[in-house]
Amino acid sequence: MATACPPLSLQPAYLSGRSARARRPPPAVRCSAVGEVMAETAAVGTAEEPLLVSAIKGRKVERPPVWLMRQAGRYMKSYQLLCERHPSFRERSENVDLVVEISLQPWKVFKPDGVILFSDILTPLPGMNIPFDIVKGKGPVIFDPLRTAAAVNEVREFVPEEWVPYVGQALNILREEVNNEAAVLGFVGAPFTLASYCVEGGSSKNFSKIKKMAFSEPEILHNLLQKFTTSMANYIKYQADNGAQAVQIFDSWATELSPVDFEEFSLPYLKQIVDSVKETHPELPLILYASGSGGLLERLPLTGVDVVSLDWTVDMAEGRKRLGSNIAVQGNVDPGVLFGSKEFISKRIFDTVQKAGNSGHVLNLGHGIKVGTPEENVAHFFEVAKGIRY
């Protein structure tokens, strides 16, 4: 087993902010067995397999791959300018040219190891007979919330080829543009999270409506969850068939469930998705992100995913121990760290990488980038991360 990176005091001056000279793009940093620091050229993906995919599969890599959730978005000036020309989120996320342009904005500036499709977990809803929109300042709005058996019976199975051909087209273009220098990432919403939006009518603070359904009419909720399960499995396969090299499943609201309720209303459906995808796409890496999942951590590998993405409320070393050695991890720097000094950002990166170890780790935040994050700090995050060597 290779040694972890050296103590922070051994990092080069350009990382600690002590250098008075103008900052230049840093060399890579190799952490040798005796803790010395050497410069070398940064690693890139191969023609056969991107670095991110290699790391997830447990292959020996020189450094942890890095990308950031919401890396394409409102903190970037280029995105803000595009929004002025195209104020509708639905337009930005459903027009092939705009999806490709936005997805590539961080790639052109930061060169992350993962380029994630610009989209939304609710994008499939119209194809399931669930009208919605995303309203500025309010977020997603489900026009006719699903709160009765009759309403759930009207939900149809999602056929991505018919309803979101622009997703497939955009993924194919991204693969051509990125050319294995980074992994192209797709994503979907998890059944319970999608059901939460659709039953609540949008975002929620207390999730009283879906919990009322779960605890008084569970058969209705199970019917809805099964429809989302079948549909999201199909959607993942569609994304993979059109160029996605890994897919992340977002179960953002699963942490509103107690462990026993997670085992009934989320875990079996996630496992069913994974089992279905692995039957047809056994080599496709699947990542599961469940924000605030510290109380559920040991249950997440039971879904069968390849990677568990940790949020920042779980210590990386503790998370590794609790998850076990047979699963890769992603994360888990606090997004708020990107508002700190460059020296502090560097320290948190090294701390996370040291605790994660030198295998099966994808460096990321513990949540999406926050609005207002200084773009130069994001650039620094990528510079430092891509300079690390195991």
Curated annotation (Swiss-Prot):
Keywords: Chlorophyll biosynthesis, Chloroplast, Decarboxylase, Lyase, Plastid, Porphyrin biosynthesis, Transit peptide. It is found in: Plastid, Chloroplast. Its main location: plastid. One of its GO terms (cellular component) is chloroplast. Substrate binds at residues 70-74, 89, 119-120, 197, 252, 367. The keyword Ribonucleoprotein does not apply. Pathway: Porphyrin-containing compound metabolism; protoporphyrin-IX biosynthesis; coproporphyrinogen-III from 5-aminolevulinate: step 4/4. The keyword Transit peptide applies. Pfam families: URO-D. It catalyses: uroporphyrinogen III + 4 H(+) = coproporphyrinogen III + 4 CO2. It is an enzyme of class 4 (lyase). One of its GO terms (biological process) is protoporphyrinogen IX biosynthetic process. InterPro entries: UROD/MetE-like_sf (IPR038071), Uroporphyrinogen_deCO2ase_HemE (IPR006361), Uroporphyrinogen_deCOase (IPR000257). One of its GO terms (molecular function) is uroporphyrinogen decarboxylase activity. Residues 1-30 form a transit peptide. Belongs to the uroporphyrinogen decarboxylase family. Homodimer. Catalyzes the decarboxylation of four acetate groups of uroporphyrinogen-III to yield coproporphyrinogen-III. This is Uroporphyrinogen decarboxylase 2, chloroplastic. It comes from Oryza sativa subsp. japonica (Rice). The lineage of its organism: Eukaryota, Viridiplantae, Streptophyta, Embryophyta, Tracheophyta.
